[in-house]
C-alpha cells in the first residue's frame, strides 16, 4: 500500500483553467466560504454547542439560517440535506408505500428513479416534445395522473417536475405544474437543483408542496449539501420524530426526525452554504445578465460548422447542450479519437466538457465574466478552424 499518493492531493483546475462544467459553475465557493471551510473543516465542527438537534444550533447561526433560507425561497420549513437526491428520498420515503406511483417528467434525473425505487414506488413519466427542443409537456401531468388513478383506484403518491433538467437546460412551467397537482389532489415536488441559488424562486405562485435544491450545485457550497423546503402542512408527516423505544434500555428519541436520520449535514458543507448565502441572495437578482451571456455564447458557438443548440430557444438557463457533428467527424479520424476536443480545449485554458465526448457537448458560462466567456468562444473557434471546420 503506497500512502504517499494521499499526502499532497491538490486541484489546480479553478486556478489554471476556466471550468465550463454545468454541474460545477453554481457551486464555486465565495471567498467567505473558503475561509469558513478552513475554520470548520474538522469533523463535527458545528457541534461545539449542540443541545440535540443540528438545525437548532445557534452558534454558528444554523437555526437562523434555516429561517432565512425558508424566507429566501418563499417556503415555510427548511432542512439541509446531503444533496437534492436525499431531499427527494426523504419526501418519497415519508409519502410512498410499497407499490405506490410517482409521476415525473421524462427528463427527470436518475436519482428521482432511485429514490422512488428505494421507497418501494414505481415511476410513470410525462412525455416531452423530443428532438430538438425536448420540452416537457406539462399539460400532460393531468392525463398521466388520471391514468394512474383509473388503473389503480388511487391517485399517485407524488408528482415531481424537474424545474430545469440536467440534459438540455429547459426551464419548465412550474406554476402550471403546481396548479394541475392542486386540482388533482396530488402533492407536488419541484426539483430545483439547477435553479435554487441561481434564480429567485420566492415569487412562484402557487407554491409547490416541496422544493428541493443542491447546495454544491447552485448555492456556492462544498459538497455534500442540499435543501428540502416544504409547506407547513407537510412538516408533521415528513419531519416526524422517532417513535421507537429500546426494549432493554428503554431509550427513545422522539425529537430525532426519522427522514433526516436524526441529524443531517454538519461541518464544512453547511457552514460554506451559510457563508455564501449573502452572495447568493444578491446574485439571483442578476439572473437576466446570466441569461444574456448564455445567449451570446450560443450565438457564437453556432457560428461553427454543424453546431446546433438543443433544447428550448431562446435559452432561459445557463446549462446548454450542443450537437457538434463537425467535431465528431474530426474525432473519428484523430489519433486521440473523442479525447482530442477535451485536450485541445485544455491547452487553451478551458476544461469542463466530458472527456471523450464529441457528438454532443454540455457547457455553462454561469458566473464567468464577459472576458472569460469570450476566451471560451475563442478557444472553440480556434480549434474548429485548426481542424478545417468553417466558422462563419
UniProtKB/Swiss-Prot annotation:
One of its GO terms (molecular function) is Sep-tRNA:Cys-tRNA synthase activity. CDD domains: SepCysS (cd06452). One of its GO terms (biological process) is translation. Transmembrane segments: none annotated. The modification N6-(pyridoxal phosphate)lysine is found at residue 217. Belongs to the SepCysS family. It is an enzyme of class 2 (transferase). Keywords: Protein biosynthesis, Pyridoxal phosphate, Transferase. It catalyses: O-phospho-L-seryl-tRNA(Cys) + hydrogen sulfide + H(+) = L-cysteinyl-tRNA(Cys) + phosphate. The keyword Transmembrane helix does not apply. Converts O-phospho-L-seryl-tRNA(Cys) (Sep-tRNA(Cys)) to L-cysteinyl-tRNA(Cys) (Cys-tRNA(Cys)). Pfam families: SepSecS. InterPro entries: PyrdxlP-dep_Trfase, PyrdxlP-dep_Trfase_major, PyrdxlP-dep_Trfase_small, Sep_Cys-tRNA_synth_arc, SepSecS/SepCysS. Its EC number is 2.5.1.73. The keyword Protein biosynthesis applies. Its cofactor is pyridoxal 5'-phosphate. Homodimer. Interacts with SepRS. This is O-phospho-L-seryl-tRNA:Cys-tRNA synthase. Pyridoxal 5'-phosphate binds at residues 84-85, 191, 214-216.
Amino acid at each position: 500500500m503506497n500512502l504517499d499518493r494521499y499526502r499532497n492531493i491538490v486541484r489546480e483546475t479553478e486556478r489554471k483553467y476556466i471550468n465550463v462544467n454545468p454541474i460545477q459553475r453554481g457551486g464555486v465557493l465565495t471567498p467567505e466560504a473558503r475561509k469558513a471551510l478552513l475554520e470548520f473543516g474538522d469533523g463535527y465542527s458545528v457541534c461545539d454547542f449542540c443541545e440535540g438537534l443540528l438545525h437548532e444550533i445557534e452558534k454558528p447561526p444554523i437555526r437562523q439560517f434555516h429561517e432565512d433560507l425558508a424566507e429566501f425561497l418563499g417556503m415555510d420549513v427548511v432542512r439541509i440535506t446531503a444533496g437534492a437526491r436525499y431531499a427527494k428520498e426523504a419526501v418519497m420515503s415519508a409519502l410512498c408505500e410499497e407499490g405506490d406511483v410517482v409521476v415525473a417528467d421524462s427528463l427527470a434525473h436518475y436519482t428521482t428513479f432511485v429514490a422512488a425505487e428505494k421507497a418501494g414506488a414505481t415511476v410513470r413519466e410525462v412525455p416531452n416534445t423530443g428532438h430538438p427542443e425536448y420540452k416537457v409537456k406539462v399539460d400532460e401531468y393531468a392525463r398521466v395522473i388520471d391514468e394512474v388513478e383509473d388503473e389503480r383506484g388511487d391517485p399517485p403518491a407524488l408528482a415531481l417536475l424537474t424545474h430545469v433538467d440536467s440534459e438540455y437546460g429547459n426551464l419548465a412551467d412550474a406554476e402550471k405544474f403546481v396548479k394541475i397537482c392542486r386540482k388533482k389532489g396530488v402533492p407536488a415536488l419541484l426539483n430545483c437543483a439547477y435553479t435554487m441559488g441561481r434564480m429567485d424562486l420566492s415569487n412562484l405562485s402557487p407554491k409547490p408542496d416541496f422544493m428541493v435544491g443542491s447546495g454544491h450545485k447552485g448555492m456556492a457550497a462544498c459538497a455534500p449539501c442540499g435543501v428540502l423546503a416544504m409547506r407547513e402542512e407537510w412538516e408533521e408527516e415528513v419531519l416526524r420524530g422517532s417513535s421507537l423505544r429500546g426494549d432493554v434500555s428503554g431509550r427513545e428519541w422522539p425529537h430525532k426526525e426519522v427522514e433526516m436520520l436524526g441529524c443531517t449535514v454538519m461541518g464544512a458543507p453547511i457552514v460554506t452554504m451559510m457563508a455564501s448565502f449573502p452572495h447568493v441572495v444578491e446574485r439571483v437578482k442578476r439572473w437576466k445578465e446570466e441569461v444574456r451571456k448564455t445567449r451570446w455564447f450560443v450565438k457564437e458557438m453556432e457560428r461553427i460548422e454543424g453546431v446546433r443548440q438543443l433544447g428550448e430557444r431562446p435559452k432561459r438557463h445557463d446549462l446548454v447542450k450542443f450537437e457538434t457533428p463537425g467535431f465528431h467527424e474530426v474525432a473519428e479520424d484523430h489519433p486521440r479519437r473523442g479525447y482530442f476536443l477535451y485536450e485541445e480545449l485544455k491547452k487553451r485554458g478551458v476544461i469542463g466538457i466530458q472527456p471523450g465526448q464529441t457528438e454532443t457537448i454540455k457547457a455553462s458560462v454561469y458566473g464567468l465574466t464577459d472576458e472569460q466567456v469570450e476566451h471560451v468562444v475563442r478557444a472553440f473557434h480556434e480549434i474548429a478552424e485548426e481542424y478545417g471546420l468553417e466558422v462563419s
